[in-house]
């Protein structure tokens, strides 16, 4: 995470750009591979990360411009999670690191949004890309999946902010470029006739020194092909 002042400044600029209404930020949830607790590697929504910085599942947030409120909605970890993860900071402590002082249980976001809807307050949201997001919009706001109308001002506000990079963002981009170069060099050193593509992918993952957010982009999705330079 960056400093809390960075996230506070980003949110303040967005509020100034949009001007009024309520901004809804849908965080991502865990996604099970073959049962609920055996999950794929988690990736937080990029917009949620940009404005709130918290890379944890099961969170959503609102910026209520009209009432000058910034709230993160989420639940504390249960003992089942703590067994696997060890002692963790509370959600309130995590949120304070992003400059958010108000945290509420996740179930309360539905009531908050419905109250705003009944008052005629504009509710801005971004395009959905997961079924879970569509289900939440239907549950909270009665928006039928496929009938979403994302807020154009919200989209433009986010895009215009993210187009311009701060020095600390550029530093992180440069680190990512170094990792990418290391992965390419590792692949070049590893590949040879008779090796499986999965071995090349494994070398890239280990050689990058960081856990990848996305799979290695090699020619075949399954990585089960043999390298044979005699074939075209």
Where do the PLM segments sit?
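Residue-level signal for secondary-structure boundary elements
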Residues: 121, 146-148, 185, 192, ...
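Secondary-structure boundary elements
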Residues: 115-118, 179-182, 192-193, 210-214
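A charged, amphipathic alpha-helical module
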Residues: 161-164, 168-171, 175, 182, ...
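Short catalytic-site patches enriched in acidic/histidine residues
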Residues: 33-42, 139-142, 152-157, 164, ...
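Gly/Pro-rich turn-and-neighbor structural signature
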Residues: 18, 29, 187-188, 210
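A composition/biophysics-driven feature that prefers long, compositionally simple stretches
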Residues: 1-181
